[in-house]
Amino acid sequence: MKKFNIIAAINNDSIIGVKEYGTFSMPWPYLKDDMNHFRKITTDTGSIESGVNAIIVGFNTWQTLPSSYRNIRSRFNIVISRDDETDGQFHKYVKTFDEAIEFASSLTNLNEIFVIGGGVIYDLALKHKLLDKLYLTHVGSNYPIDDNVEKVVHFPLTWSKIEKMCDSNFLELDSEISKHDIGKNILLRFQEYSVKKELYWAIEYLKKNTSLDNKGIIGDKGATGSKGYSLEQHDYYSTEYFWNFYEFITRKVFDLFNSSNEISIPSEECPENQYIELVKTIMEKGIVKQTRNSITKSIFGYQLKYDLSKGYPIQTIKRSYPKAIFEELMWMIRGQTDVSILQKKGVHVWDKNSSKDFLSKYNLPYEEGDIGPGYGFQMRYWGAEYTDCKTSYQGQGIDQLNKCIESIQNNPHDRRIMINLWNCSDLDKMALAPCHFCYMFGVDLYEVPTTSGKKGRLNCHLVQRSWDVLLGWNTTTAALLTYLIANHCDLDPGILVHSISDAHIYQSHIDSGAISQLLQRKCRKFPNLVIRNKKEKIDDYEFDDLIIENYYPCPSISAEMIA
């Protein structure tokens, strides 16, 4: 049978996966460089024509993989499962690890065999006589282990144990390449190891690091008592005895290696509890209403307040989407009203409210994907005559955003620094009247600028007429706008106040169980947001200019967007 390799990504605490609220996920945010590394290693078949790599994976891990991963011609997946399952074009089910290796070795045009997890499968692979190489990504991050976490999946070896194995010449580090994911501020180290002593390393390790020696290795205690064996009495590489003995001895070794050093983060009072209390208040005291687009449970008048110097208020009790929030905000900042611009960037929050059926329903004469003179148009071209989303309005109307920036820079104590999106004369031309309609800004100047050149802090008050509370983006969007303008004007982010008139939850979100899922959860510390540089114009910022550190949300909650 052919030798095989292990490929794994592992964080500082040797964690490879976590389970929260019934969902398994990786213990770090999406890391493009690591995904590209994994794809390159597992799809490269060298010079073999129509070559294929075999992928050995446990059933639970297989269930978490998207179809785009499963159906790649250069990879054939062998799934280890206790149950009988139906094979597919690109995968086969087997019952044991050895059966997986045997089947992989029989594949036509086979290049390499890779074991990709999860934890139990890695454990079997590390103890196997045919293990050849380890491709490990050291993800330089820690996951907050709190009451939300139901299960933590560890790689069987900690980083310190891997280092000791190299020092003792059981493993050899062949190569290491480091990359810094600037946007997440996470260092990645791509490492390749060779197994030097094959199976014998386990016995040698015990001889050197425990009280056992080659004259009295103790076997498992059974009904007939303990039995002692002498290493010199056996030809270990040719007898069946050795493999049974090896299984026992490696269990002892892995008991030594498996000590956990995960970091437990005590729960603290977190600002997101305000949001959770809002949801509870709506559920307990809300009035049921038949509204324009659906039945809601609503309350009138609520306010949230966040100190932006202590964290970026993005939801942690369910996964939010920092890039989508950024792209939608920049779409508005650039005065754009063409939804296809967002769609090309993978953002689809405006699809329903700009569909042909939706526009026809409200007698709007636009092509599909045109929202009319909404958010961004009012922010940058207030008072201009709107034609369609393809027309240029450069130099027309009032640029409220730039006027705000000029006031913040030149007249920071002005009490009229405001962006108003509620233009009554244009409301019937919009696909959707603005849900959030007013940003008001205030500046608190420092007596002396900071060492980094910050002259004060920028505060923001967002006023919103109507809020889909489960979606929850508007707080984060307002915070991000405050961070961007503050950075652009050499200020620190200050206080964000979010005032809502009609705060509501859609009945369909209650009926689907989404709200009950939400209320079972506990929030976490907000991530840190840093903007790496200062651009010439506010329009020029890209998502790669942001660093979002330590964002570890609970799993996403599925909920249909109501148009």
Curated annotation (Swiss-Prot):
Functional note: Bifunctional enzyme. Involved in de novo dTMP biosynthesis. Key enzyme in folate metabolism. Catalyzes an essential reaction for de novo glycine and purine synthesis, DNA precursor synthesis, and for the conversion of dUMP to dTMP.
NCBIfam families: thym_sym (TIGR03284)
Official protein name in the record: Bifunctional dihydrofolate reductase-thymidylate synthase
Cysteine disulfide partners in this protein: none
Keywords, in A-Z order: Methyltransferase, Multifunctional enzyme, NADP, Nucleotide biosynthesis, One-carbon metabolism, Oxidoreductase, Transferase
One Gene Ontology term from the biological process aspect of the record: methylation
Organism: Acanthamoeba polyphaga mimivirus
SUPFAM superfamilies: Dihydrofolate reductase-like, Thymidylate synthase/dCMP hydroxymethylase
Pathway assignment: Cofactor biosynthesis; tetrahydrofolate biosynthesis; 5,6,7,8-tetrahydrofolate from 7,8-dihydrofolate: step 1/1
